[in-house]
Amino acid sequence: MKNLCIIPARGGSKRIPRKNIINFLGKPLISYSIENALNSGIFDEVVLSSDDEEIIEVALKYGAKAPFVRDKNLSDDYASSTAVVQNAIEILQSQNQIYDHVCCLYATAPLLNKDILKQAYEKFIQNQSKFLFAATEFEYPIQRAFYLNENNQVYMFDEKHYKSRSQDLTKAYHDAGAFYFGTSKAWLEEDFIFKPHSSVFVLPRNLVCDIDTIQDLEFAKILYKVNHESAF
């Protein structure tokens, strides 16, 4: 079995400029994902998909490969991760590089480690599902969620759960925004991962942080330090 890790990292992040290579506790943010992928020992190649020369330079420095430059039409705010992975697989196949399994690993997942990737891959192989992705449990019952209308009035999405006990409600999970394993065939044929053909690898909340704002970035640093207390 040949395994490929693809790390998408475009240059045009807006809320945090240069997010993928921003300083994160002394190293570029993307370096954590590259090193975890390389040190996991499960990938034959770790490949960057980027449209940005500086990001490519940083990724090469930390051991990733960059055999192509991503097209600009796959580098805007509307390009999906699935389309980026499909593009990378097709380019590599045209170069006679064929892989059985492909993992899309986000550049913004510094809280992971090599052992998590190994365990997730083992579960992916064991389950024989089309995809396996990282998820985490919602910290509050989604059945009690509400919204505000145009007059700022409160409405529950479903009032029947107003008096339900938390322990009686079905647990709900969300995408952790970290990694997605899949067969090459599934990546090329499917356009939606969140279906019964997928399985999940549940992460504890201290290993999950969606880095979209400066506040998210600072919180991720705090979590990293807590998770690696002996190193600080």
Question: Where do the PLM segments sit?
Answer:
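N-terminal glycine-rich phosphate-binding loop and ensuing alpha1 helix
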Residues: 2-49
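Conserved acidic residues
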Residues: 3, 44, 65, 100, ...
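Short active-site oxyanion
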Residues: 42-47, 130, 206-207
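A conserved hydrophobic position in a structured secondary element of the catalytic/binding core
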Residues: 50, 107, 112, 181-183, ...
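Short phosphate-binding loop-to-helix
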Residues: 53-101, 111-112
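Conserved core of the sugar-phosphate nucleotidyltransferase
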Residues: 83, 101, 110-197
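Short aromatic-hydrophobic micro-motifs that form the base-stacking/packing surface
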Residues: 103-105
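Hydrophobic helical membrane-anchoring modules
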Residues: 200-202, 207-232
